[in-house]
Every structure is written in structure tokens, then in C-alpha cells.
Amino acid sequence: MLLALAQWLQNDFGFLRVFNYLTFRAVMASLTALVIGLGFGPWVIRRLTELKVGQAVRSYGPQTHLVKAGTPTMGGVLVLIGIAVSTLLWCDWGNRFIWIVLLVTLGYGTIGWVDDYRKVVHRDPKGMSSREKFFWQTVIGLFAAAYLAFSVSETSNMRVLELFLDWVRSGLSLSLPAKSHLIVPFFKELSYPLGVFGFIVLTYLVIVGSSNAVNLTDGLDGLVIMPVVLVGSALGIFAYVMGSAVYSKYLLFPHIPGAGELLIFCSAMAGAGLAFLWFNAHPAQVFMGDVGALALGGALGTVAVIVRQEIVLFIMGGVFVAETISVMLQVTWFKFTKRRYGEGRRLFRMAPLHHHFELSGWKETQVVVRFWIITMMLVLIGLSTLKLR
């Protein structure tokens, strides 16, 4: 919005040309989201407290968590407001990638909000059923995947429509352009063609998987938000590179026109995330809830798909991956041993993984900071793929 206003007035006020610089708008988007979060955070926490939107704590979990009972949850609303307002203020409204990322983020946030609302307001400990939640995640994920399959390699929605019609006329056999291939990190020119259906399936798995992985990681004060900020910031750098004809050519990446604008979104996400961490740091004054975790995970997955860095997201989000795998292994092993031996056995003291370390004697703050450090290292490895190819 501010970009359009500045471009309209820049002939009379030359200093407004600074708005044309993507890096300037990215910095301002981050600061705007940070100010919104810090400014409205206390009010949001008070309102959540007054509404008695308190977190329920499982009695069979770590005993140190019992003191957290009643802490306001659904604080992810604050993050989403910061992201949405800041992005819309500083982005180019004509950029199609911004809108699809916002759609996924707010759509998944809505799913999380309904789930949280049922849990804390209706006092339903189950919230949305797994089937219902998965259905709506699938609807949004498949819609985004289908659009991006034809959008990533094109420069406008008209070209997207033309590519889709060409695909239909070809009997659904038309191959997607090379820009839509799966990029393999650390190799200069190694990529795999996916085809339309392959692209849609991969995109769906990345978006839904990332959303649920971030949600599983959100279990300790400050644990999930810093990795989200770090990974999101790194994806913003990839977006800037892929959106630049100069940098993408120099670094041997496909040029994706319009992808650079996602730096605005990622910067807003970083600013909003840091503001939330101010209140979520141990001892937390507010919890994110599914409304924030599902949305942020979906956002990371969508951005990664657009900038063709699905594998790099898997690397940088290693903490999210480990948490998810720990749950899958725990459930699978428990069911297998129960069927074979008559009683279920556990691989971990408790899943997700952060609870295993807690029950192994690590303090909560140790788990959190050590997971942050691991994420920092993984993000640096991910960023190294820009040049080490």
C-alpha cells in the first residue's frame, strides 16, 4: 500500500524513491511488525487473561509444567496480526506470491484458531478432531499446490492461466518448465523434473508437513518461535536471490520473477516473531497456540516451495523434522510392541523429543537454547548452499 502511494508521489517528492528498494521495505516491514507486537502484546495478553483463555497442562507430562496451567494461549493471533498488517503496508499489492502465502498463513491460522477456541472456550480437550483438521489443511494445501504448480515459472496470472490451458489441451501430459524442477542443494545443475502431479504432491506434503511439524515443536517457552524466525529469515534471503535476475544468474539458480517480494513477508514474520518472543520467553506470559504454530509452519512451507528450496527447508528445519520423527517413531513402536508383547513400549521417555530431554534431566531453558543453537547451525548450512554448489 505504501509502495503504491510512494510511487504516485515520488515525482513531487524524490526521497520517496527509496520505497522502490526491496531491502528498505524489508527492514521497515520487520520493524513495523516488531512495534505492533511489542505495542499491542500487553493488551492482547490482558484480554486473553480476562477471557480466561488459559492453557491446559497434561498431568502425565513433565511435572515442571504444572505451574503453567492457566497461562493465556492463542497468542499466535498477535503474530499473525503483525505479519498481515506489516506485509500489506510494505509489499507490492500486485505480487501474486504475497497473496498466496498470506492465504495459506491466515487459512492455517483460522484452522488453529478454531481448534484452540474449542479447547479453551468450550473446554473440549480434543478441540478439532484430527480428521477435521487434516481435511481443512488438505483443502488449503492442495489449492495452494495446484496454483503454484503453474505459477512458479510464470510472470503473471494470465501466463499461469495460459500454461494451465496448455496442460489441459495436452491431455495432462505437458511438462512444467525447468524453473519448477526440484533443486538438489550442493550441486550446480542437478535438479529433478516433477511434472504437474509430482509438483502438487510434493508441495502439499511440504506445506502440510511443515505446518504440523512446527505445531509439534511448540511445547516449551520460546522453543518454536526462534527457529521459525531463523528459518524464515534465511528463506527471505533465498527469495531475494531467486527474485533477482542478477544474483540468481550469478549463483546459478533459476530466476523466479516476483519471488523477491517474499522478503517483505519473511521480514515481517521475523519482526512479529521476535516481538512474540519478548512475551513468550521463559517464564512465558502467553503461549502461541495452534493458531500461531499451524500458520507459521504453513508459511515456511509455502515460501520454500515458491523459491524451490524444499530440501533446504528440510535441512534448516532439522529441529522440526526431528520432533516430528520422534512422535512417529514413538507411536509406531508403541503400537508394534503392544501388538507383539501385549503392552506398549516406548523408544523415548516422552514425545515430542523436547519432552524426552526434559525427563532426562535437562532444564527447560537448556532444551530451548540448545535447540536454538542447533537451528542456527542448520540455517548456516542451508545458507551455504547458495555458494557451495
From Swiss-Prot:
The keyword Iron-sulfur does not apply. GO terms for biological process: cell division; cell wall organization; peptidoglycan biosynthetic process; regulation of cell shape. One of its GO terms (molecular function) is metal ion binding. Its cofactor is Mg(2+). The keyword Flavoprotein does not apply. It is a multi-pass membrane protein. One of its GO terms (cellular component) is plasma membrane. Keywords: Cell cycle, Cell division, Cell inner membrane, Cell membrane, Cell shape, Cell wall biogenesis/degradation, Magnesium, Membrane, Metal-binding, Peptidoglycan synthesis, Transferase, Transmembrane, Transmembrane helix. Its main location: membrane. Its EC number is 2.7.8.13. Pathway: Cell wall biogenesis; peptidoglycan biosynthesis. PROSITE patterns: MRAY_1, MRAY_2. Pfam families: Glycos_transf_4 (PF00953), MraY_sig1 (PF10555). It catalyses: UDP-N-acetyl-alpha-D-muramoyl-L-alanyl-gamma-D-glutamyl-meso-2,6-diaminopimeloyl-D-alanyl-D-alanine + di-trans,octa-cis-undecaprenyl phosphate = di-trans,octa-cis-undecaprenyl diphospho-N-acetyl-alpha-D-muramoyl-L-alanyl-D-glutamyl-meso-2,6-diaminopimeloyl-D-alanyl-D-alanine + UMP. The chain crosses the membrane at residues 25-45, 74-94, 97-117, 134-154, 190-210, 222-242, 259-279, 286-306, 311-331, 366-386. It is found in: Cell inner membrane. Belongs to the glycosyltransferase 4 family. MraY subfamily. Catalyzes the initial step of the lipid cycle reactions in the biosynthesis of the cell wall peptidoglycan: transfers peptidoglycan precursor phospho-MurNAc-pentapeptide from UDP-MurNAc-pentapeptide onto the lipid carrier undecaprenyl phosphate, yielding undecaprenyl-pyrophosphoryl-MurNAc-pentapeptide, known as lipid I. This is Phospho-N-acetylmuramoyl-pentapeptide-transferase.
